[in-house]
């Protein structure tokens, strides 16, 4: 496959990457809400969500430099710590483009490790170091999303309606086959729960489907022409701070909205593709090098 075809293929919509872009839309919503919600409430939201990630490389966003963001979606599935998604994004004002590079978390990388294994032993710091070593790039910002608390965002944004392929019971809730309506955080959490050891793939699919519906809610909010009530935005901001930890400060967020807004809206995706080796998913060194080259171009 030549590079032109490779680039075109990688720009196709990818579920996990589309889900991850929720966070960037939320940042825009949170700051744009300043005109309607009390300034201190928004500032407090970012203060609550703020977490220092000491291994990151500092950058002056006011100079409109290209910056990188490591986005990690994690949670507990059947009492086990699980990394659901790992994405490195570059946001470039010169090209007005944000490029997402997706790492398959269950695949063995050229260093003979999987992201899930690294997360289980070394947490977010382990993923950070692994991505940095694989790509040999500086990481400026980190966004950590707690999948288990995603239900609070679903509730705050009005709930979701979706198709459930198989009936099951979880945590006191009955989910029938067909259309299901999830309105509360507890309902969402129960729906995403892994029922038993045979339910891992299905539970991850349910998490992805919930995420896609939540993405739709956020998109509608981002395009609303009429502002809602004070409490409506306050609940969204609270859910944001409950679900997300990041070293993007309130001042960073304001600068990003003012200087990088167009770049955040124009996105492309790079996916590391896997091959099957003895029943296991593997990312080859050739594949990593090829995608790494494309990502490096997004930084220039």
At which residue positions do the language-model features occur?
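Amphipathic, coiled-coil-like alpha-helical scaffolding segments used for oligomerization/assembly
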Residues: 121-179
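N-terminal post-signal-peptidase region of extra-cytosolic proteins
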Residues: 55, 67, 71-76, 84-88, ...
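C-terminal solvent-exposed extensions
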Residues: 66, 70-73, 77-78, 84, ...
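Extracytoplasmic/secreted envelope proteins and their assembly/folding machinery
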Residues: 85, 124-132, 147-151, 155, ...
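Second-shell loop/turn segments in exported
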Residues: 75-76, 113-121, 136-141, 195-205, ...
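Extracytoplasmic
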Residues: 64-66, 81-86, 95-100, 126, ...
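Entry/capping segment at the start of metal-dependent catalytic domains
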Residues: 11-97, 193, 295
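Flexible, polar/acidic helix-loop-strand segments at domain edges
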Residues: 155-232
């Amino acid at each position: 496959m030549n590079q032109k075809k490779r680039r075109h293929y990688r720009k196709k919509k990818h579920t996990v990457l589309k889900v991850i872009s929720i966070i960037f839309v939320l940042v825009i919503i949170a700051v744009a809400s300043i005109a309607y919600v009390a300034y201190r409430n928004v500032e407090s939201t970012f203060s609550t969500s703020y977490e220092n990630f000491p291994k990151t490389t500092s950058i002056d966003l006011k100079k409109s430099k290209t910056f990188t963001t490591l986005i990690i979606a994690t949670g507990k599935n059947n009492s086990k710590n699980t990394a659901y998604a790992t994405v490195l994004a570059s946001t470039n004002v010169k090209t007005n483009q944000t490029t997402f590079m997706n790492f398959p978390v269950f695949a063995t990388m050229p260093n003979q490790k999987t992201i899930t294994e690294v997360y289980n032993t070394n947490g977010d710091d382990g993923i950070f170091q692994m991505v940095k070593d694989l790509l040999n790039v500086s990481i400026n910002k980190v966004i950590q999303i707690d999948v288990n608390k995603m239900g609070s965002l679903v509730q705050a944004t009005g709930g979701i309606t979706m198709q459930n392929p198989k009936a099951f019971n979880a945590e006191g809730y009955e989910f029938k086959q067909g259309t299901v309506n999830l309105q509360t955080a507890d309902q969402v959490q129960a729906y995403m729960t892994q029922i038993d050891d045979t339910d891992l793939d299905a539970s991850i699919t349910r998490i992805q489907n919930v995420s896609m519906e939540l993405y739709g809610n956020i998109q509608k909010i981002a395009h609303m022409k009429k502002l809602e009530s004070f409490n409506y935005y306050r609940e969204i901001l609270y859910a944001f701070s409950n679900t997300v930890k990041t070293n993007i400060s309130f001042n960073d967020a304001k600068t990003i909205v003012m200087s990088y807004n167009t770049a955040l809206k124009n996105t492309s995706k790079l996916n590391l593709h896997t091959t099957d080796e003895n029943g296991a998913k593997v990312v080859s060194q050739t594949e990593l090098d090829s995608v790494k080259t494309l990502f490096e171009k997004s930084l220039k």
